[in-house]
Structure formats: C-alpha cells, structure tokens
Amino acid sequence: MSNQKKSILLPGSFFEKDSQYKLNYLNLKNLHTVYVFDHTVNPVDSKLAMYEIKNAVSALQDYEERNFNIGTAVLNINKRKLDSLITKYLNPFLEIDNFKLGLGIGDNKYQENLPNYSNSLEEVIGYLFENFELSKDSRSLFLGGNSNENIRLMKKYSIGINQWLGSIKQIYKTRDVYKEIKNPKGSISLCLNKDLALENKIIFNDIELIYIIRESSTEDYRSQLDHFFK
C-alpha cells in the first residue's frame, strides 16, 4: 500500500454553501492536509465568493471532527505589512498543531499583486526559525514555486517546496535537489488538477500530492473527491 501523502486545496467559494456537509465528506477520505490559498478575488470567476485565508483556517480549525491537518498553499508575505503578517497570520497559524505553512511572494497571474509591501522572504524564514520548532512531520514550512531563488532558500534552510502544476520532469528535477537535504523542515509537494493526475498515474511516493478542487456544485465536489481518493 502506498504511503504517499495526498491532500487537497479548497476552492474559493467552498464555505458559501453546504460547507458542513462538504467537510464531513472530505473527513471520510484518507487525506493528509486541507490547504487554503491567499486571494482577494476568486481566481476562477470574480463573481464567485472568495474566502479570506485567516477566516478559512479558523473555520477548519473549528471543525471538531477533523482527521486532517491544515495548511496554506500559499500565504502571500507581501500582501500585508510585516508586523501584521507576523502577529495576525504567522504566529496564530503556527500555534496550530501540525500546521503546514506555505509561503509565497505573490505574482500577477490571477490578480494584480497589490498592495505589495516587498517583505523579505528570507527575513520571514529567519523569524520563523527563531520562534518556532519546525519539522517535516509536525509544524512545517515550505515555499510556493520552484524558482532558482526558492531552490536556494530550500537548500539553505532545509525547508520544503511546492510546484504548481507544470511538468513531472520539473518536479523530479527539484526532488533530486530536495533529497540532498538531511533533515527537511517541510515536504516537497505538487499541486495538480484532474488532467495532470490522469496523465501521470504514478508519481514518486515521497512527493506530496495536493489536488486542486475546482469550483463546482456539491454533487460534483463529491465526484472530484471520489476520483482523487479512490
């Protein structure tokens, strides 16, 4: 039996309708972590609702029956002033047992990256190491995107890394570098949709798979979970 970690990324309007039912249904699946992302506007359709990342984390934390971890994929460090980022997001998130903290610097792919407070990613990482005990299997840290700079930081701080879609060849290349880390403080993971999953039936077990749940009806939501967690 595979010991591969399988997780999901919640769509922006997840909490608008039937959220309790949907949480109960995903709680039946053998999933590792439920991740939320950090957008102001729904990236699929601006007319759809979009959860605020802190509120989404709180809603998941308040779900008393949960059998899964909670994480961010990813928290945009440049969206808030540094003091607010630390006191309202980083500190509360890492007070949660086994929280999987993904960090990013934002881009303009789905929405204009404004405001941009140009916080230093390396400074934020340093703060986290000074104030929290991090490990791959408990409270952990990873970076969103396998750019050259993120690869450098991954190696320097022995943290995890995530790839958003892209090619299997690229994640395997990143994996080769990640495997050189002796005691990583976070996992290597791949965000993938149904198409990418169908194209690649087998992916190395040490890569966490984060399935992107698309915006859909409650019935289709169930169908997506059933497909990813057979």
Outline where the language-model segments fall.
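N-terminal beta1-alpha1-beta2 module of alpha/beta enzyme domains
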Residues: M1-E65, R139, I213-E215, R222-F229
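Flexible, charged surface loops at secondary-structure boundaries
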Residues: M1-N3, L26-N30, L134-K136, M154-K156, ...
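Hydrophobic faces of well-ordered beta-strands that scaffold small-molecule active sites
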Residues: Q4-S13, H32-V36, R66-A73, F99-L103, ...
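Internal, glycine-rich beta/alpha segment that forms the wall or movable "lid"
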Residues: K17-L23, N42-D45, N78-G186
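Structural alpha-beta junctions
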Residues: N30, Y63-F68, P92-F99, K179-G186, ...
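Structural motif corresponding to the early beta-alpha repeats
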Residues: N55-S84
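C-terminal alpha-helical cap/extension of soluble enzyme domains
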Residues: I188-K230
